[in-house]
Amino acid sequence: MSQDFLYLLSKEQLNKKFISENIYPNKNLNYYLCNDLSLETYIKLCKSGFISTSIILDNNFYLLPEIQFEYAILDFNNLHISKKVKTLIKNSEYKFCINRDFKSVLNQIQNYHKDSWIEENYEKLLINLNNLKNNNSNFKLVSIELYDKNNEKLVSGEIGYMISKTYTS
């Protein structure tokens, strides 16, 4: 992060007009702060294109929403998988799962990243988002998991989210 300052976003600013006029065109700032930890605000940030982690500044907890300057989109309808990769997947010693054990993925991320952005407040927020049912927002938190087939041990994972049919992490 190489910005000189972090702009504090309010819940009220998370609307199409403000974001279209002030955030998207700004190619100098891509990190912001948000002190509203509500599920509604987190989902609004996601739907506006932000990927949020967290930060503690002066003993205060904030979401750290990032609006990336560049994105990548995978078109799975036209995805080519080579024969070598198909064979590797078929004969793999690993099992790929989605949403099998969210809490274990969360713990693995915290253990792997010693200076983790997943501190107590952010962890609670993620757990509450994961428990969210029938929220009418087309938002769903997703844990992606890779297990060793021999011992069922979680080898790798990540947490992202889906809005409608689009996955982001």
Where in the sequence are the language-model features?
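N-acyltransferase acceptor-side catalytic subdomain
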Residues: 1-169
